[in-house]
């Protein structure tokens, strides 16, 4: 192989490494969203609602194992968490998960997404009961929102079709 080809491959390799590093340093984004019935709540960068389990206090992680099939932790990744307008950096933190990953907390609450929320404005995890506790949306002030979810299906973009006494079966 000629020196010209080797230089080309070296440049490509360095470029690929640079792109990989750019993707690796992305940080989660948290922002504020106004949702009917709930007020101003914390959402992720895609506008999806984030939740807190009632049994998880002071950064203590209880949702692990099969719980993670339903609730997806908001992980810190690399770099500083990006906060949108209306959120307080003083309330932002992290806690260590059992696997060593850092999970984002807001006002001490470890944050999760619910597997049934697929569009901004949905809050189908609100009031769900399971072995990890009862799940609540987190307000931008750092408090849990206890407003119950609708008890009948809305077919739209908000609420839950099973109400606030849903139990997630299987773990």
Spans of model-derived segments:
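Short, basic/polar N-terminal leader/transit segment immediately after the initiator methionine
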Residues: 1-6, 14
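Compact beta-sheet-dominated domain cores in extracellular/mature segments
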Residues: 4-7, 20-171
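Cleavable N-terminal signal peptides
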Residues: 11-15, 22
């Amino acid at each position: 192989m000629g020196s010209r080809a080797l230089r080309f491959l070296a440049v490509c390799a360095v470029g690929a490494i640079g792109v990989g590093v750019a993707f690796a340093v992305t940080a989660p984004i948290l922002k504020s969203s106004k949702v009917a019935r709930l007020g101003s709540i914390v959402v992720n960068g895609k506008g999806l609602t984030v939740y807190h389990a009632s049994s998880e206090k002071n950064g203590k992680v209880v949702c692990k194992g099969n719980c993670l099939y339903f609730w997806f932790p908001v992980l810190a990744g690399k770099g500083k968490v990006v906060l949108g307008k209306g959120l307080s950096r003083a309330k932002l933190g992290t806690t260590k998960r059992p696997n060593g990953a850092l999970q984002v907390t807001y006002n001490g609450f470890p944050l999760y997404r619910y597997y049934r929320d697929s569009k901004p404005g949905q809050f189908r995890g609100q009031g769900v009961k399971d072995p990890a506790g009862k799940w609540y949306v987190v307000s931008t002030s750092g408090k849990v929102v206890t407003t119950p979810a609708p008890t009948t299906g809305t077919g739209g973009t908000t609420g839950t079709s099973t109400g606030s006494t849903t139990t997630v079966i299987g773990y």
